[in-house]
Amino acid sequence: MQHKWFLPSTLAVLAFILYAQSLFFGYTYLDDDRLVANNFWFIGSSSGITQAFTRDVFLSTTAIYYRPLVTVSLAIDAFFARSPDNLLPFHFSNIMLHGAVVVLLYFFLQKLGYSKRVSFLSSLLFLVHPAFVQAVAWIPGRNDSLLALFLLLSILSFLHFLEKKSWVWLGAGVVTFALALFTKESAAMFPLLILPLVVAWNKKKPAFLYQWVLMMGLLTVYLVWFVARSNVVISSTSFSIVGFIAAFIHNYSAFFVYLGKLIIPIHQSVFPIVNGYSPNLGVFVFAVFVGILFFLRKKRTVFLRATFGLTWFSLFLFPVILFHNEGFALGQDVQLEHRLYVPSIGMLIFLLEVFVYFRNKKWQKLYFTAIGLIIVIFAAKTLVYSRSFISREVFWDQAVKTSPLSAFAHRNRAAMYQLAGNPDQAEFAYQQSLKLHAEEPMVHGNLGLIAYERGDLEQAEQLYLKEIEINPAFSLAYLNLGRLQIDQKRLEEARKNLWTAYLLEPQDTASLRLFIETYKESDPEKFAQLQAKFFK
């Protein structure tokens, strides 16, 4: 038993050592502030777990992402953190998830028939790969490591089931698939890999009864997930065929950028955008892989397994490029690197099959020496690159440096200047953002706040109104406009805007309190009634 667990334990320890510095990282202000700081009132309470399945992951009124198990994981961390200022439990969980995935990957590769040494080195390569830094060092990156954890548990369960024809393992496979689906919607692709897996590894098909139960189990999971998700995700966020096509036209090059970055991790960015990187490296790699696949076609088993690996990679990556986030201008969709985490498992299988086919025992020592050298280089790069996530200032400086064409990156760097009390630097950075995208959300509203703090109320009001025109769902624009109108004694207008702000973000009571406050002098009786109604 000790020998069996020595190598996987080594992987887990190395994962912790490699990413230990991230335990003390702060907020990046890319989603982590929304998921943890802004929502701590929810995830830090008992509701964080009991109501996770009835909310979207951001607790947003424009719900898009139904990922309840991500919320549950954050709620567990919040229990230990006790405060949104303590991020250590959140980062610790991210490291533990990565270590667990690497250990499961080791067992998965062995289950597919690869030797212990090959499985260990392959898992170690996955562990240190710089493309996965964002999945570990950035708190929201756990989307993908948690997804990988449940997918690997599911596929291992199915492999055990195919060997032992056990109802227990069949049930475990279905349950862990359900956990994956309730973690991230891209898990819906996973059942498409079950039959290719059976064929590629010459597994004996189970009896019809098992197949029928498996199909019914998967369909039940889909149905339960679909109903639960439909009750949370608003219908206006559904995607049309036209939307898919438009997104693909603007984002297709991301497939090649991702591929190139996975094979040779250069030109990395904490905030890469579609039109900011050349796909040439990925196109070249793709052409080479197609040629290799064509060459392998004569050896059926290797060909099928290599094809399975590429199918896995493509199935989990294509959804990334088929959706356009309406928060970004076309061509400025962000293609974050953590999304490579799950697809890369398939690519690893493809590369292992190529390695097995072309391996020459005479050169075996050279092969493993080269792999060891790559692992050392990748580990060093990961150690350095991880520090890009150390703080919000470092993060957005790196984002602008590596994605200078991103209006969003310039906007958020400006916001960091503004939070740090540097309005002049913030204003300049906001103007840079507007040069790239004249209607970048939040920019006019934040410029309005700078004008307000300078005492230029007329310009501030114009900027707030412009923000509302561009971004009518931005509650802070209404809140800040309401504050300005209170200063000008325009109470009726202020009440209208403050109430709108409250309706847009009901969990943020600042606008509601200010709305009620406007009645304190003019209508004390109504003030008392509203106080009693909303703040008993």
Predicted regions and their residues:
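Canonical positions in the second alpha-helix
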Residues: A399, Q432-S433, K466-E467, T500-A501, ...
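Terminal, low-structured helical/coil segments at or just beyond the last alpha-helical repeat
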Residues: L512-K536
